[in-house]
Amino acid sequence: TGAPGFFGQGLGLIGLPGASGRIDPAALAEALSAPDVSYRQPAAALSLTNATEYGTVYSAHALAALIAPVKAKGYGVHLDGARLANAAAAGFDLKAVKTLGVDLLVVGGTKAGMPPTEAVVIFDRALARRFDARLKQAGQLPSKGRFYAAPFIGMLEDGGFVRHAAHANAMASRLADLTPFPVRHPVEANGVFVEMDEAALGRLHAAGWFAYRFLDGSVRFMCSWATTAEAVDTGIEWLGARDPAWTWHDLLVRAPRPAIGLPPMALDGTGASAQALSAVPVATQRN
């Protein structure tokens, strides 16, 4: 999308391969062993995502195996936690983050049922210098920002942060178990990726469902804290319907849930946050 380069003043991304969104340690080792020469952007940090964009979850052990060689090279580590709650609900130990060598953690609140907010946790205090200025430069200073941040307190104190994510994960597992289409990736968090033909996808769109083909060609479904079992069952009933003339309205008559807009199982609308080895712009390498 160009966002990293725009906000990073020329920062580039070096994509790293891996199965189902998890970086292959061998691919990372190969990237780290690349020579530092003038015609290559030098690496600066490793960016990881947990849960990943394909709905899989890194264990603390798997993250440690990726982070250790990066720290040995003197690079930084960024952990994108847009779906960190979903990873925690799937068994990832949140307390392990502070011992893994992560320098900067972004904790997503939106997907756990909060307003559109993220909490930035800076473990390397050197990176915190004038962070307020960076926020202002990025336009991240909304009026009354404390009201956006306040839900984090309640959600963390009463366990809602992980509880909501556990529900989303359970709905994804339900969808994966019932879908008539082959599931492309392991369902470990709240995402389900299926192999679907264009005709079926077209019928979904015509019926009002919001789903699209992801980077690998699979069709992406995301379940949220608000997704109901009835919505999942209704969607599955429609997917299994032989009559393509059936619509979402037709199935509402058959499903035990009220007609309130689009199905809660609809795509969450956020863009992908790719896992990559970040690279500093050559012109500002010494900054």
Could you say what each language-model-derived stretch is?
Residues 233, 254, 281-283:
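N-terminal non-cleavable signal-anchor helices
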Residues 1-207, 211-227, 235-243, 247-266, ...:
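Conserved PLP-enzyme active-site core in the AAT-like
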Residues 265-287:
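Long, low-complexity, intrinsically disordered segments
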